[in-house]
């Protein structure tokens, strides 16, 4: 049951009866509203308590997930229509979206976590609980292999090649690639597979999947997002956190450590090197140090 079930039902009836929208458009509107509601469900917010800051924070999280600005704008449009309807029918006195601007086109880089912040988040997973073991294993692969959230939730048991130190993932366009994963990732994966997963009542359509929820079904992207957000909050991290943040941090730390850009491109599954260059944010201090260490003029200055 949704927190805003009554209001969503009324809006749905309005879309079908008053506006005569197609089933596809009707469902798209409701999905947009339910995304916002799911986001706010971490700390439940009543419909009449939603304000502009909630909407802005939600849009920022969509951005951190790598959602394109055009898709963010469409989602905001659905949410805006919902609140306008609630004002019109007297449920609300004001519309929290009235001053919210549509997301600007263009691509901004998501927040990057430091290694210490990554470690602090990983340590919040409670290894005394089944979900904690699973969550630790998932985050180890998000950061240790730079997986997209869809690649993590779609990871199959047959995709694990521990002896070779690789996993097989299916990226965009269902393209397969082999990605190296570290010892800690396999360590916590084995702990999950040996001590947790055997006790889960696995659904028939999920037997091939690695990571499951407590009911034995595959995990949703939203669930992984909420897990990341919850553990980051427990670690005292105030940045906008999502599964995408771990992937971005994976790439950033590799480049800062001296990894070849082409190798990072292959691990991330980017078709174009330009995507990797945009995706990989190098801080100014690192770039300055690179110039000081390797530029001929800098070396000349040291000899004078």
Which functions belong to the PLM regions below?
Residues 1-304:
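Conserved catalytic core of the tyrosine transesterase superfamily
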């Amino acid at each position: 049951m949704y927190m805003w079930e009554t209001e969503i039902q009324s809006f749905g009836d309005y879309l079908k009866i008053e506006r005569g929208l197609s089933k596809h458009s009707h469902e798209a509107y409701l999905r947009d509203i339910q995304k916002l509601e799911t986001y706010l469900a971490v700390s439940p917010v009543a419909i009449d308590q939603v304000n502009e800051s909630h909407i802005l924070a939600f849009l920022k999280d969509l951005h951190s997930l790598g959602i394109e600005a055009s898709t963010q704008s469409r989602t905001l449009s659905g949410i805006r229509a919902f609140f306008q309807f609630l004002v019109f029918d007297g449920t609300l006195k004001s519309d929290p979206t009235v001053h919210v601007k549509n997301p600007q086109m263009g691509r901004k880089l998501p927040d990057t976590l430091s290694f210490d912040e990554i470690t602090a988040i990983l340590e919040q997973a409670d290894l005394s609980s089944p979900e904690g073991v699973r969550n630790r294993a998932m985050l180890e692969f998000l950061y240790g292999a730079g997986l997209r959230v869809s690649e993590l939730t779609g990871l199959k048991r047959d995709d694990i090649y521990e002896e070779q130190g690789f996993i097989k993932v299916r990226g965009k366009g269902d393209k397969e690639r082999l990605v190296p994963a570290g010892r800690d990732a396999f360590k916590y994966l084995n702990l999950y597979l040996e001590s947790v997963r055997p006790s889960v009542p696995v659904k028939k359509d999920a037997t091939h999947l690695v990571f499951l929820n407590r009911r034995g079904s595959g995990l949703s992207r939203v669930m992984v997002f909420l897990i990341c957000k919850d553990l980051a909050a427990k670690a005292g991290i105030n940045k906008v956190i999502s599964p995408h943040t771990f992937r971005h941090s994976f790439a950033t730390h590799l480049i800062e450590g001296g990894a070849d850009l082409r190798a990072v491109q292959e691990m991330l599954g980017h078709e174009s090197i330009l995507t990797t260059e945009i995706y990989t944010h190098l801080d100014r201090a690192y770039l300055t140090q690179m110039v000081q260490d390797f530029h001929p003029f800098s070396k000349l200055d040291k000899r004078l």
